[in-house]
A protein has these predicted regions:
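Short, contiguous strand/loop micro-motifs
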Residues: 2-3, 16, 65-69, 99
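Feature captures the FAD/FMN-dependent oxidoreductase FAD-binding
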Residues: 73-126
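N-terminal Rossmann-like FAD-binding beta1-loop-alpha1 element of flavoenzymes
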Residues: 1-28
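Glycine-rich active-site loop/strand segments that organize a redox cofactor
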Residues: 46-92
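Short N-terminal binding/cap micro-motifs at the start of the first secondary-structure element
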Residues: 12-14, 35-38
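Extended acidic/charged loop-beta regions that coordinate divalent cations
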Residues: 42
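Short, conserved beta-strand segments within well-ordered enzyme catalytic domains
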Residues: 28, 48-50, 100, 122
């Protein structure tokens, strides 16, 4: 199977890794010069990966069923396990916010890009 992913942001990179893990040939098309660029600005440059105190009462959108299903399928523990499997060390603040131990969003982008490269995901930029 061949998979084309439009956009090399967090979702695009995660989707590419998931599809590649299932054996698909994957190509990411990103209009920026490199993937993950917007991730560098998240969490004031620290990249808040998740929150250990995440509950549905914190969700204020219109489709609560979708959010609940998504959170159950890929909860905080699974998110942290995923990033740990890529070699990212995280830290949890008293508020429950989870950040890379480096406190740099670039660390998250680097482990994702390295995983894409190691798994043979084709990336076309600009």
């Amino acid at each position: 199977m061949k998979v084309l992913i439009i956009g090399g942001g967090a979702s695009g990179m995660m989707a590419a890794l998931s599809a590649r893990k299932e054996g698909a040939e994957v190509c990411i098309l990103e209009r920026q010069a490199r993937v993950g660029r917007k991730l560098l600005a998240t969490g004031n440059g620290r990249c808040n990966l998740s929150n250990t105190k995440l509950t549905m009462k914190n969700y204020h959108g219109q489709n609560a069923v979708f959010a609940q299903t998504a959170l159950q399928a890929f909860d905080t523990q699974k998110t942290l396990a995923f990033f740990q499997s890529l070699g990212l060390i995280t830290t949890v603040e008293p508020s429950g916010k989870v950040y890379p131990l480096s406190d740099q969003a670039g660390s998250v982008v680097d482990v994702l890009r390295l995983a894409l490269e190691e798994m043979g995901v084709e990336i076309r930029t600009s």
